[in-house]
């Protein structure tokens, strides 16, 4: 797959990209130069595929738990599902102060889905890329949250919900008034208020996406660097780093979920 450490690192950090090349048409990019030539609308096939696959696993597991729910002794899968639901419901109850029955299911979906995508980091870094290379694919990353396209996609969805509920709860006029007269309630400071509020609004999806991406990407880079070391050294570093990620992986999913609930709670607050 790679002859030098630099090529090895570049290979493992490059996504499988499909797009329109100005000279070759619609192709799977074989080099970083081809990826660059494809431009903004190129598709990261691995990120999209693994995101959908983890979402399907989430739906399948919770659907199975719901179908097998019994009044007697619950199964292990049912216990896991109930623990997740009760945990998320507790967070939403303490954090969200509006009235919206969709917030708790949304928070549950975000928490479990992001956790499942993060958990792909536990798969050794060479396994899936090596298998993909044997199948003729030049690149293949398996952690969707280590790709900014994946994290920005989720955070953009959250951002659209923030705007939607802000307008739905407060009305167009109320939302505009909030942007215009916060934090300083004077007409002369409306331009300054709008500047501050719009910047603050735009930083919400930005912070959500970059926080998750930064942590997952950095962890992936460390795993790749460890894989470059001699075999007898790898285990001594891989095991502690993997154990550390037992905390990092659910923590990042939790932070993403909590911030989403906090932002939606603010969107439901009517200041009239």
Curated annotation (Swiss-Prot):
Q: Which PROSITE patterns match?
A: ATPASE_A
**Transmembrane regions:** 39-59, 103-123, 124-144, 152-172, 181-201, 221-241, 242-262
Q: How does it sit in the membrane?
A: Multi-pass membrane protein
The coiled-coil regions, if any, are: none
Subcellular location, record wording: Cell inner membrane
Which Gene Ontology molecular function entries are recorded, alphabetically?
A: proton-transporting ATP synthase activity, rotational mechanism
Q: From which domain of life does this come? A: Bacteria
The Gene Ontology biological process terms listed for this entry are: proton motive force-driven plasma membrane ATP synthesis
Predominant location of this chain? Answer: membrane
GO CC, sorted alphabetically, is: plasma membrane; proton-transporting ATP synthase complex
Q: What PANTHER family does this protein's entry cite?
A: ATP SYNTHASE SUBUNIT A, CHLOROPLASTIC
Tell me, in a sentence or two, what this protein's role is: Key component of the proton channel; it plays a direct role in the translocation of protons across the membrane.
Give the family this protein belongs to, as stated in its UniProt record. Answer: Belongs to the ATPase A chain family.
Q: Which HAMAP family match?
A: ATP_synth_a_bact
Spell out the subunit comment: F-type ATPases have 2 components, CF(1) - the catalytic core - and CF(0) - the membrane proton channel. CF(1) has five subunits: alpha(3), beta(3), gamma(1), delta(1), epsilon(1). CF(0) has three main subunits: a(1), b(2) and c(9-12). The alpha and beta chains form an alternating ring which encloses part of the gamma chain. CF(1) is attached to CF(0) by a central stalk formed by the gamma and epsilon chains, while a peripheral stalk is formed by the delta and b chains.
What is the name of the protein in this document? ATP synthase subunit a
